[in-house]
Amino acid sequence: MKLILPKDYHPTLTVRDTEAAIVYIRETFQDKLASILGVQRMSAPMFVEKASGLNDNLNGVERPVGFDMKAIPDSEIEVVHSLAKWKRLALKRYGFGMHEGLYTNMNAIRRDEDLDNFHSIYVDQWDWEKIIAKEERNTDTLEVTVMKIFKAIKATEKLVTARYPGSTYRLGDHVSFITTQELEDRWPELSPEERENKIAKEEKAVFIMKIGDKLKRSGKPHDGRAPDYDDWQLNGDLIFWYEPLQSKIEVSSMGIRVSEESLREQLKKAHCEDREKLPFHKMLLEGKLPYTIGGGIGQSRLCMLLLGKAHIGEVQASIWPEEMIEKCESDHIHLL
C-alpha cells in the first residue's frame, strides 16, 4: 500500500460542499467535452459476455469480476475494466458517421488495482470514441484531439474557480508533448514512473506518447497496454503535476485505435494471436469496424485535481484498507 500524506493538509470544503462541487464539475465538464469534441452521450454496459472479447484486458494480468446469470446459464459475464473496444463496436452498431462520436458515463471495477492516493478498485470515467478516416491515423490527429480535451479541462477549471474561489487547484496553461523513447533517452537511469514525475514537474501538463511497445534502451515497455485497442505508436497519457502531493496525476489515457495491420502486429508481439478468433477482433480484421480515436477521462481524478484533494477517496465512495483509513483520518483526509 502506497500512501502520500501531505504536510499540513486541511480540506477547504466540507464533505457536503465537496459533494456539491463534484456534481458541478461532472456536469460542467461533460457539457464542455461534448461540445468541444462533438460527441453524443450514449448508454453503456456495466458488464459484457467474456466470449465477446469486448472487455479491456488492461495489462493482461488483472482479473475481471465475473459471474453467471440465471437467464443465460452457460455464459460467463464480466464487469468491464473499460469500454475501449465496446465503444468502437457501438459506433458501427448505432450508425455513427464520419467524424461523429459518442461518450459514456463508465463505471468499472478493477479488483487487482494497487491502492494509493490516485487509485481505487472503483473506476469512473467519461469514455469517448470518435470515427476518423484511415488517413487521419497520425500524430497530428492525436495531438489536436489532446489539445481539445485540455481545452475542455481548462474551461471547466475556470468555471469551478469562479464558483469555489480558494478551493480550486491551478493547472498549467499549456500542454506539451513527448514520447516515451524521448523520456528514456533523457533519463535512462530512472524508472518510467520517475521519468513521468520529472517531466510533469517540469512542464506542469504533458501528454506522453507511444505507450505499450518496447523501448530501445531497456527493451521493456514504458507501461503496459492491451494489444487490441490502442495503436502503440499513436496513443498516450495526459498527466498533470500535482503540487499538493508532489506527484504527477494521470487524468486521461487515449489513442488512435488499431487498424487491421497494427492489430495483427501487436497481437503477435503480445503473444495473443488466439484473440483473432474472438467476434470483435474478427470483425476488425475483416475491415468491418470504423477507424476511430478514443479514450477515457477519470471523473474522480478530475474532481480530485480541480478541488485540490489529497486522496481520491475524498471524491468517491469505495473500500479501503483499515490502515489507510486510519492514516488518512489522522492527517485530516476524510475518505467517503
Curated annotation (Swiss-Prot):
State the similarity comment: Belongs to the class-II aminoacyl-tRNA synthetase family. AsnA subfamily.
Q: Which UniProt keywords apply?
A: Amino-acid biosynthesis, Asparagine biosynthesis, ATP-binding, Cytoplasm, Ligase, Nucleotide-binding
E.C. numbers: 6.3.1.1
Catalysed reaction equations from the record: L-aspartate + NH4(+) + ATP = L-asparagine + AMP + diphosphate + H(+)
Stored PROSITE patterns: AA_TRNA_LIGASE_II (PS50862)
Which InterPro entries does UniProt cross-reference here?
A: aa-tRNA-synth_II (IPR006195), aa-tRNA-synth_II/BPL/LPL (IPR045864), AsnA (IPR004618)
Q: In which pathway does it act?
A: Amino-acid biosynthesis; L-asparagine biosynthesis; L-asparagine from L-aspartate (ammonia route): step 1/1
| Stated name of the protein | Aspartate--ammonia ligase
Identify the coding gene.
asnA
User: Main localization of the protein?
Assistant: cytoplasm
Subcellular location, record wording: Cytoplasm
List the CDD domains. AsnA
**UniProt GO MF annotations:** aspartate-ammonia ligase activity; ATP binding; catalytic activity, acting on a protein; transferase activity
Gene3D superfamilies according to UniProt: Bira Bifunctional Protein, Domain 2
A single cellular component GO annotation: cytosol
* Gene Ontology terms describing biological process: L-asparagine biosynthetic process
